[in-house]
Amino acid sequence: MFTLDSIVGAHINYALDKTAHLPETITNNVSNVEITLKDYQYFVSRVFIGLKNLNSMLLFWDTGMGKTLTAVYIIKHIKELFPRWIILIFIKKSLYIDPWLNTIRAFAPDISNNIIFVYYDSSSSLDKFVNIYRSIENSLNKKNRLLIIIDEVHKLISRSVKKDNSERNFTPTYKKLIKLANYEGNKILCMSATPIYNNIDEFNNLIGLLRPNVMTFKEEYIINGKLINFKEIRDTLLGLCSYKRLIEADSFTETNYVEGYAKKNVIYHNIIMSEEQSKLFNLAEKYDYKTELGGLKTMRRLVSSFAFYDLKIKGDLNNIEYNDMIKRKLAEFSEFTKTINFSNNFIEKFKRDDLKNDILLEDINNYNILYQYSCKYIEACRIILNSRGKVLLFEPLVNFEGIASLKYYFNCFNITYVEYSSKTLKTRDIEISEYNNYENNDGKNIKVCIFSYAGSEGISFKCVNDIIILDMPWNESELKQIMGRSIRLNSHNDLPLENRYVNVHFIISYTNNRKSVDKEILDIIKDKQSKINVVFDLLKSISIESIHNIHKYIEPVESETIFDTIRKTRMREMNISNVIVKIKLYPIMYCKDYDRATILKGLLNKENNIIYNEDTAVAKLTIENNKPVFIIVDDNLIYIADDYYE
């Protein structure tokens, strides 16, 4: 490995020796139950507390690994390092009561009143932080130090990244945090299962928060799925991260059952819109391109979900007039669905996708009308009816072309459901409790939980067998968070071993001339994630766990030196133009095995059968009997390929 590793390893052992007296347990004062920390929780707590100059740490842990409890343990024992601390916790507002306040009151009630909470998704809370910032800064002296904890740090970082080269409103707060975190003796602990959310720029801002002024990370450093200056970057960031991910695969990769995590199967449903929905999609496409919504694909996304007679364009309507129009349309659709009551015979045939014979005329007519408006909702109902257990359905749209209309489809097919969204604030916690109840593990009482972005982070679902992604988010991190609501440590322990699985269903809708906004967004997500995965591999390599695994038996240092040096040493900039990587690539045409209708162009490396789009590896040839598989389309040779992730 590298020389610096052994020095950092010796410092880790110094911290472990220094904190050997800390208890492995923490007591729940509400239930009077003593909980033993997991080895990784105890390890990172001791290293973070034991090293004065290791002032920053990222907990890059899977969802459900106990980040909140670990943070509370650190808060409880940080006085081992210094007697007086101000605790400043940045969180999403929805996470204040559960898990944060409940966990603190249970395990550290004596300090619960001495913690300052700031909600980074609340303008009034941020204003409050600005007002108290000066008093916090003035109180930092020889008698007081500051511990900053940031939960779901990717959410905070994404608010600080420049948009269209313009400074975001959150940037001044971000700069204040950097100043506070790097005041002599202070510490900052950041937590996330997905520390990079949208793009590489966020990694720069994350480093700027944790270890400012040491480097500027450039996307150009990633060539052919590798970091060209890996050693320099690694040395600069060594020991910055704690890494605990039992499932390293991204959202699109299937995984087996492992260490309490359910098996994950990934299923793509490629479905065709009705002629009516296809026509409205084409109109929506023209509208998007004529307006500023083209890049966001807004109208096309709405129509891909639900297309009821016409486009719902606001135009010159004010908010009240527009909302009234939507209410009238929804009431009209609601009135129509009240007359639909599918027979049991039809539902059984619908589940098997066998609607050719022996069907009541009324059933088939009603089905055709519902399909005309939304092929996605129809497919979602089929998946739900075929599920052996409970189902989670992610739909970010809450109003007309979203949850509001989807629920009427569920009523038509006699599907029971609860809703967790911004519209159900008063009832959602009680309903989720009923959904998670042990007696509902098979979904017989409540089959589906529909949830929007309001439920994509911070809450847990138990014993779920199917997740349906009805509308794509913009990045893989959001997908990971969505799946993390139900694929969590021990989330399926109450089910028999053979039922500890989760099927993840992606519903991809196409017009009758093969246009698809879902496929466009899916490709964008995969392209961005290929670069983010390179950074995740880097974070694993710099983690205190990776270093300690190699140097756990090295002699501890006698006193701290290295982290103060690392924090103040800037990485040497690399001249990208001096780096030459020679790979011979051949232009080809190919298609994905699951979507042979979409013909793509790429560059093939014949040595490893990997296909590139510019500098990014995007696919790999399908090989059978040592030969690539191909088809002939319009006299063109089209290779068959699968998605590829390095």
Swiss-Prot record:
Reactions listed under catalytic activity: a ribonucleoside 5'-triphosphate + H2O = a ribonucleoside 5'-diphosphate + phosphate + H(+)
Subcellular location: Virion
Gene Ontology terms for molecular function: ATP binding; DNA binding; ribonucleoside triphosphate phosphatase activity
Pfam families in the cross-refs: Helicase_C, NPHI_C, SNF2-rel_dom
InterPro entries: Helicase_ATP-bd (IPR014001), Helicase_C-like (IPR001650), NPHI_C (IPR013676), P-loop_NTPase (IPR027417), SNF2_N (IPR000330)
PROSITE patterns: HELICASE_ATP_BIND_1, HELICASE_CTER
Sequence motif DEXH box, residues: 151-154
Domain Helicase C-terminal: 377-540
GO biological process terms on file: DNA-templated transcription
Gene3D superfamilies in the record: P-loop containing nucleotide triphosphate hydrolases
Keyword Cell cycle included in the entry's annotation: no
Enzyme Commission code: 3.6.1.15
Main location: virion
GO cellular component, one term: virion component
Keyword terms, alphabetized: ATP-binding, DNA-binding, Hydrolase, Nucleotide-binding, Transcription, Virion
Binding site for ATP: 61-68
Domain Helicase ATP-binding intervals: 48-213
Region of interest (Binding to the cap-specific mRNA (nucleoside-2'-O-)-methyltransferase), ranges: 466-532
Source organism, top-level taxon: Viruses
Assigned protein family: Belongs to the helicase family. NPH I subfamily.
Subunit structure: Monomer. Interacts (via C-terminus) with RAP94 (via N-terminus). Interacts with the cap-specific mRNA (nucleoside-2'-O-)-methyltransferase.
Function, in words: DNA-dependent ATPase required for providing the needed energy to achieve the termination of early transcripts. Acts in concert with the RAP94 subunit of the virion RNA polymerase and the capping enzyme/VTF to catalyze release of UUUUUNU-containing nascent RNA from the elongation complex. NPH-I must bind ssDNA in order to exhibit ATPase activity.
Name of the molecule in the record: Nucleoside triphosphatase I
Natural source organism: Heliothis armigera entomopoxvirus
Gene from which the chain derives: NPH1
